[in-house]
Amino acid sequence: MSQQDAVAALSERLLVAAYKGQTENVVQLINKGARVAVTKHGRTPLHLAANKGHLPVVQILLKAGCDLDVQDDGDQTALHRATVVGNTEIIAALIHEGCALDRQDKDGNTALHEASWHGFSQSAKLLIKAGANVLAKNKAGNTALHLACQNSHSQSTRVLLLAGSRADLKNNAGDTCLHVAARYNHLSIIRLLLTAFCSVHEKNQAGDTALHVAAALNHKKVAKILLEAGADTTIVNNAGQTPLETARYHNNPEVALLLTKAPQVLRFSRGRSLRKKRERLKEERRAQSVPRDEVAQSKGSVSAGDTPSSEQAVARKEEAREEFLSASPEPRAKDDRRRKSRPKVSAFSDPTPPADQQPGHQKNLHAHNHPKKRNRHRCSSPPPPHEFRAYQLYTLYRGKDGKVMQAPINGCRCEPLINKLENQLEATVEEIKAELGSVQDKMNTKLGQMENKTQHQMRVLDKLMVERLSAERTECLNRLQQHSDTEKHEGEKRQISLVDELKTWCMLKIQNLEQKLSGDSRACRAKSTPSTCESSTGVDQLVVTAGPAAASDSSPPVVRPKEKALNSTATQRLQQELSSSDCTGSRLRNVKVQTALLPMNEAARSDQQAGPCVNRGTQTKKSGKSGPTRHRAQQPAASSTCGQPPPATGSEQTGPHIRDTSQALELTQYFFEAVSTQMEKWYERKIEEARSQANQKAQQDKATLKEHIKSLEEELAKLRTRVQKEN
């Protein structure tokens, strides 16, 4: 057996010894090295010894250094376990060692809660003196005073109130201690709370006061005490019920009757002296002192000496008694409390006023003081008025059977009942009027609320419609802007594509012209004599390319034959090609005619300015490239003319060729200028057309938007008229 197993066995034995209170075994096990073990519920030996009340074991464990505030599975400490059983000695020992007083278990209860719940006032007193929190609440929001009031522990309640606990604190349901005591019908606790100036008008979360709770649970004595303490019977709960209506709803007639007489109870509860009691009793006896025959009549006996004068005396006496009772209601309340033969009054009907009650029946109740007679009258109700045999002054008449009948002179005995019914009818009429007034007020308030609600809805609808219209307007404007932007971009793209196509077409035409010109020159070279082939090839290289042969002046230029014929044929072909194009105008034709009729001196002047014209007039890459090459080709010729005079044949051959190229370049320049002007005009026309189309489309969209806005405004007006008609 290992050392750990031995220590575990010793710890288990320590638990058993602490549970059984075996002091010697506990000491031996601690000396042997037993450690603190726990049960399946998480309780230490200190928990077990404190719960079982083994004070020596607790003292030994405390001296051994056991932890005081260890909590079990229910989060209870040893102080909780000792407080549950009310062992004051162990509680005092734990407090002396410095245990935590306000440690809460899983339900939020402290040791003071446990002492108050179980009613251990001495334990509560020890905890309070040690500094326990009197106002601590558990998870349900209950203080220790709530728990003491719930279980009717008056001594613990008194201790807590003296310690400073507040009776008006509410739990999570909104109940005060007075609510709890009224719910569980604890009269002594209610009296204690009322002496501590507890408020009787506090409401819980349902809006109920303590009087509502007593009325709902049929606690008549509690309701009476609360009424004597000044509870308001007109307070309404969340269901809109007063305590009287609550008692009627729960079918509690006794409490309902008590609440209907609440002003009488309040007057009855005021302080009275014996002298006033005796004076009132004497006055009541004097009012009840009647002749013997009237006393007999009041007892319900039938005598032959009944006369109308005695009946009138009884009526006068009853009127005097009613006046006295209305002046002093306390004997009336006393009589109501004493008599038990009174028929039960429903809680749903109004109490009968004293003036409407039958005088004979009241006399019977006051005159019969014998218990047997009271028991006899308790079960039997008074006979109807017509069943009395009345011997008085009467008039004789014969009935249908011919028998002699008698009728009273002073009227029927049903008059009190009729008067009572009339009074009840008037009371019901007043109640109905009051209810109608309250219903009318409620209807007015509801109608006002509905009107405010409809106005608010109308304002919301107006705002929504305005926002919707503005959103649609902005959306339409955005769409128009996007549409115009897209059309503009498409027009620009079309223009760019047309410009590119025109450029490519022009380039193709220029290339074709150059190819034809180069082909004609090659044909002329082929027709020339073999003696001039080398010079003609040198001249072609100088004119066409700017190679290394242009820099060398070894081979002199040779003039080609038939240069005039070539010049005329080249100009005719160029004019035919340019005239065959579809995009040239009248200006281009005039330019061609003028260039064809230029004199020779202007051609020579243009030959000198061929280089600048090429650099300035060309707008394509091909013409831009051909200008410098031709300019470079012309430089050696100029230098040769400036250096040494060339032969006559060379000057005659190079002159026409240079004039042809300069004329072709000038023609292409004029051609591109005409094309560019025509393209600019075409661009302007297209832009104007696109702008006009966009403006027309914007006008159309604007008109449609205005029509849509008008339709929406008409719908809004229809909605407003419909809502007004519904209201």
UniProtKB/Swiss-Prot annotation:
Biased composition, class Polar residues, residue ranges: 298-312, 566-584
Record PROSITE patterns: ANK_REP_REGION, ANK_REPEAT
One cellular component (GO) term of this entry: cytoplasm
Keyword Repeat: yes
Function recorded in the entry: Recruits CKI-epsilon to the beta-catenin degradation complex that consists of AXN1 or AXN2 and GSK3-beta and allows efficient phosphorylation of beta-catenin, thereby inhibiting beta-catenin/Tcf signals.
Native source organism of the sequence: Homo sapiens (Human)
Chain intervals with Basic and acidic residues compositional bias: 280-296, 314-324
Renumbered residue ranges of the record's region Disordered: 277-386, 548-586, 601-657
SMART domains: ANK (SM00248)
Presence of keyword Repeat: yes
Gene Ontology biological process terms from the UniProt entry: negative regulation of canonical Wnt signaling pathway; positive regulation of JNK cascade; positive regulation of Wnt signaling pathway, planar cell polarity pathway; protein targeting to chloroplast
Keywords noted in UniProt: ANK repeat, Coiled coil, Repeat
GO molecular function, a single term: chloroplast targeting sequence binding
Parts forming coiled coils: 417-446, 682-727
Positions with biased composition (Basic residues): 363-379, 622-633
Name of a matching Pfam family: Ank_2
ANK repeats mapped onto the chain: 9-38, 41-70, 74-103, 107-136, 140-169, 173-202, 206-235, 239-268
Protein name: Ankyrin repeat domain-containing protein 6
Biased composition (Low complexity): 548-557
Top-rank taxon: Eukaryota
Self-association state and partner proteins as the record states: Interacts with AXN1, AXN2 and CSNK1E/CKI-epsilon.
